[in-house]
Amino acid sequence: VAYGKQDRVETSSAFSAISGEELRKSQVSTLSNAFFGRIPGLTAMSKSGEIGYDEASVWLRGQHTSGDNGFMILVNGYEVSGFNQITAEEIESITYLKDAPALALYGMNGGNGVLLITTKRGRPGDGKLKISVTGRYGVQLPQYKPRFKGSYEYATLYNEALANDGLPAQYTERQLEGYRTGNNPYLYPDVNWYDEILKSSGHIQDYTLSFRGADRFVNYYVMAGFMENKGLYKGTDGENNSNIGFQRINFRANADIYITKMLTAQVDLGGRIEDRKFPQVGTGTMWKNMATYAPNLYPVRTPEGYFTGSAKFPNNPVGNLLGLGWSSRHAYDVQATARLTHKLDFITKGLSAYAGIALNSSYQNGYAKTRQYAYYEPIYTKGESGADEVYFEKRSNDTDLSVWTGSDSETSRMYLQAGFEYDRRFDGDHHLSGLLMYQQNTRSVLGQQAIYAQQLIAGRINYAYRQKYLLEAVVSYNGSENYAKGNRFGVFPAASVGWVISNENFLKDNRTLNFLKLRASAGLVGNNRGASRFAYEQYWGIGANKGYYYGTAVKYYDAFVQLALSNEDLTWEKSAIYNAGLETRWFGNRLAFDIDVFLENRRDILVDNRNSIPSFSGIGFSTPVNKAKVRNYGTEFSLMYYGQAAEVSYYAGGTFSFARNKITASYETPRAEPYMYRQGHPVGQPFGLEAIGFFRDESDIENSPRQAFTPVRPGDLKYRDQNGDNVIDANDEVAIGRPTVPEINYGIKLGVEYKGFDLQMLFDGLTNYSLYLNDYNFWPFVNNANISDWAAAGRWTPENSARATFPRLTTQANTNNYRSSDFWVRDMSLFRLRNLELGYTFTPGK
């Protein structure tokens, strides 16, 4: 639990825990990618597959706010910036704190949830030194490669699109035949850019060496690990260019030192050193070009092996990969902590005092070797016989590699803690424990003069009577220098109660129901993420396009102007959280079922006040104000069964989480129609037009509301007139689809073991969220883009108008079809096998 430990039976607050052993079942390069489907209430979603930058996006009980939904991550009691600096191999357990009593000790920092990461330590029973060596090697395969048309179909469909636009065909029958036969790949290229750039697989490997032991005076754990992840790009040599690569060395040394019977010391050191290397061209650009470059744009190389290109498209995707050089990022993160604990039994039994310090340093630096490559443009001509011919003209020159050293980025944190802990049982019936602590922390960033600083005073009392009736009360007083004087500190109270019904006499010896606990909690927590630095202050400076014109020549002069108004009432977000839970164990503890329900009312969310400033004031800037509110509610449960049949042991179970939010107060621009307001909808709800099909013919167009964006033709998207004014425009936009954060996530775990062999499977699923297809990747022929198989197969034509699933093809940036509408929204629900593991355990002496 927060800043301490409690007996789970006597805990009345809500939390979930997972062991490091469970996390290690997934071979991943970043810790967050091991969370999928494993922790109730925690949603993990992949946003990128780029090696070294593939951390999952994580939400704790969904979206709490329209601001920053980031949460606290603590390693051995002290905050860290993210998951990257720690690996599953060094983790003993992760605890997810959920309700107000569990979070209130963190004051204005705990509102979005807290993850407590506890690393491995030596244990008094470990005895002599134990050495552990682990090694794993894995192959990574691309889950899916988009499918696009080859040159013959591309050119044929491009002619169709031109005809739809009322324009003449671009490709002749001779050219179409050349693309179809593929006999001259330089004159009639047919390039699959994905196949030219991507390999069939990459690899990941990691190795760990650890030492663990204990004696009368010290318990210790020491670990060092190495991980390497190589990407999918072809043909790279590592000197003139580079595949995507990620290497990490991580280390940890934890020690508990028994100085005297009354005084113990805890010393921890952990960190990582990382190196990322990648092509000079950005990953986003690389993948966009692979998806949009036409297959007949030009061949990859000339007959002599030089890269090709053109004036309009000089960036040959393969040339960009192999000919521009490479970039790298070096980073390290080190956390060192020390804590002294002294028993004060001479004052009263169970009392102790402690003091601790934590230092954390993070550093990043960039380095690159860059160059330019020569490209040759294909020139198409007619030969003496009238046949099509091609030759290549050089348009640029090769350059040597040049070295670039990027700027440094460095952040340092320091935490100081001191406090008293109390833990005592009276007469076997009463258990009283408590905590009173003080903490201050500072964070400095290279290049910034002002230091981030916070102070915290917090207390907690826990009482249990005969392990049946439970009570917890928490309060903290927390402040930040990021707010105006007089408005920097806040009080965060919370309380919970619990009833262990299975310890009552009428259930105590029940053989079916072994454990039953009810609990409920309420309290106030805060969230100070999202506010910019000293946002309460007014700012003056040289504003862009804020100057004046003087003189007969009407010359422009910059001006020193006000850029932001002052708002000294600015404060943090506040959440009233209510939670109720049930924990059960059945059939000799073989079946476990836990469930929680929650309601959170978030207020004082920062929004822009621009909408409240009259335009005649001449003020062209805004000031953040605490005006928005969000309600978030949901449930989560876990179910697990462990069984044994002869020599076969097995388990089956899973987790389920649901979290839904609604904006209950907003500060938005007055809108033309009630259905256009964001209030009443979830955070991040997309808005757009409602598509009701395609125009069938000119008669259909004439008898439908006028679509004001551009003249339409048969096969264009047709939209619903929401307000009945017989015009389709921006005032007809309604809520479409769902936000991009899943409301529901679930996981299923299955396993079986027989005579040392074991098989384990993990499935995970996400649902109730959408993706919006909104760029050239999905718009055929716009800017000479490629066309996908699904667009070609579903395109509208007069012959298949009743079966069409895609608008008519066009070479224009059609402002009617390619605007925000539910036609481009896709349900992203998924269910997949996340992890499959087959193993055998060797037992010495057998």
Q: Locations of the language-model features?
A:
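Conserved small-residue
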Residues: 132-184, 281-282, 628, 642-740, ...
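Extracellular/periplasmic, surface-exposed regions of secreted and cell-surface proteins
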Residues: 23, 70, 254-273, 279-282, ...
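Short, small/polar-rich motifs associated with maturation and membrane association
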Residues: 1-251, 265, 723
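C-terminal extracellular loops and terminal segments
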Residues: 32-34, 622-631, 670-689, 735-747, ...
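Extracytoplasmic gating/loop element in the C-terminal half of outer-membrane beta-barrel translocons
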Residues: 170, 294, 299-302, 319, ...
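Glycine-rich, aromatic-lined ligand/substrate-binding cores of catalytic
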Residues: 739-772
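Outer-membrane beta-barrel proteins
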Residues: 78-122, 126, 144-148, 190-208, ...
